[in-house]
């Protein structure tokens, strides 16, 4: 962090939209095409979507703080192309993870908070949201509730997929081989928009040259990527 609490540590590549970049399948559904600065978003469901968000933010020059999520895999983030030097983690924040997250809002573009079952009072949530607005940062609450959250993102797995038959797996058949990804259903709702649902594919590369795990709009996957039986 910069040591200047009133200024984000690192400016993103494009601050003109006042939104923090997210993967394309999400950006198409969000009002600001990203996570609006100064807001709180609640995310539930598939961890891979959270990891994809973290990867996208750091790829675009942003700083991310992660609080209260000791099992969140940074290896998975690296496989999605995250810049690990731009991630600060507090896996065990003690009895008050909300306070730790509030402090990190001073120096991070995005703070990811696992509430660990803590109920946040509306009065306190307003204070934290005010801090996010002042610092032009964003808070992403994972697996819990947050009174007054502007946006809610719910995700679920629809199908798993095996690695595609091709140059790397010439003998692959439907229902065999390592999992090569999954199809997800993503629902975005908020105080300023009706619920909108879309589908996305998480693609895991097979043997061969190292390629990142990617989250793309449904239908951009290679046609060989068949649903496993």
Predicted regions, residues:
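Structural beta-strand/beta-sheet cores of well-ordered domains, especially the beta-sheet scaffolds
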Residues: 39, 109, 182-184
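Hydrophobic/aromatic beta-strand patches that form the interior of the parallel beta-sheet core
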Residues: 41, 65, 88-90, 140, ...
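C-terminal regions of RecA-like/P-loop NTPase motor modules
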Residues: 162, 193-229
